[in-house]
């Protein structure tokens, strides 16, 4: 068997790396995603949606995390760095645990007033921190001499995009995230509205929630059984549909450049 010289292998790897970097640099936008198991890279919808939107996907979602973890990762600099922030066009949040993320009863006027690190006791407070901190970080680039936004009036324009759960079973979260979006004037990726089925109608053959058709596991919400985690992979129908819904929302904010 003929051996391939090590130099040839290294050269090929170098060319592939440079090609990937070049393709990323040619994208019109960069979108940063934070989330948990519904958003992690093994799903595929975010990457599909970014491709349709001519955007570079920066997927920092990790299964098992919550919005509290996202807040803590901003604090320790692992969700994004200041250098990355310079190039991020939108922060997309898909932390969709079925909690009230709008409750204003314990919110602080200033994000610096929250005790850190965050625990998982108050989802609304963690959302409030992430939003205010991201907006502040974008604004403060106006004081960074290395930033292209240095000495500008507004700093870096901050775009935050919220997401519903992938179907309409999680009423508490879906309702409250829309209230949160309305409060801030943020766009919402309405997966639950455009996924193609509703909790209000059962499947005519199975007699179950239609979401059960697309998952290998299940969850109980208010005594009713729904599908839980949609099947992973870009080839899966739900991932493709979610990618299309996401791209449709993002194109309304960021038009595809010629």
PLM segments and residue spans:
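Catalytic His-Asp segment of secreted/periplasmic serine-dependent ester chemistry enzymes
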Residues: 165-258
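A cross-family glycoside hydrolase active-site/sugar-binding cleft signature
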Residues: 61, 94, 163-164, 192
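Conserved SGNH/GDSL esterase-like catalytic core that processes O-acyl groups on lipids
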Residues: 27-33, 38-125
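Short regulatory "switch" loops immediately downstream of catalytic or recognition motifs
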Residues: 101-103, 133-143, 194-204
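Active-site segments of SGNH/GDSL-like serine hydrolases
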Residues: 98, 131-179, 183-184
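N-terminal secretory targeting modules
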Residues: 1-43, 51-55, 79-89, 141-156, ...
């Amino acid at each position: 068997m003929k051996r391939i010289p090590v130099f040839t292998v290294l050269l090929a790897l170098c060319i592939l790396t440079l090609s990937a970097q070049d393709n990323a640099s040619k994208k019109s936008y960069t979108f940063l995603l934070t989330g948990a198991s519904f958003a992690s890279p093994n799903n595929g919808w975010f990457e599909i949606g970014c491709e349709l939107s001519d955007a570079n996907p920066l997927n920092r979602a990790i299964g098992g995390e919550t919005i509290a973890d996202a807040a803590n990762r901003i604090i320790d600099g692992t969700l994004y760095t200041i250098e990355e922030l310079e190039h991020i066009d939108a922060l997309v949040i898909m932390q969709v645990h079925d909690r009230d993320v709008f409750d204003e009863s314990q919110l602080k006027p200033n994000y610096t007033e929250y005790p850190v690190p965050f625990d998982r006791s108050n989802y609304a407070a963690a959302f409030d921190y992430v939003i205010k901190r991201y907006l502040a970080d974008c604004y403060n680039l106006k004081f960074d001499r290395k930033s292209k936004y240095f000495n500008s009036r507004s700093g870096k324009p901050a775009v935050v995009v919220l997401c519903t759960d992938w179907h309409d079973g999680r009423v508490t979260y879906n309702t409250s995230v829309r209230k949160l979006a309305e409060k801030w004037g943020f766009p919402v990726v309405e997966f639950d509205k455009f996924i193609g089925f509703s909790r209000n109608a059962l499947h005519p053959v199975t007699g179950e929630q239609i979401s059960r058709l697309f998952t290998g596991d299940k969850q109980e919400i208010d005594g009713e059984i729904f599908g839980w985690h949609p099947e992973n992979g870009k080839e899966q129908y739900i991932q493709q549909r979610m990618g299309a819904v996401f791209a449709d929302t993002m194109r309304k904010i960021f038009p595809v450049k010629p």
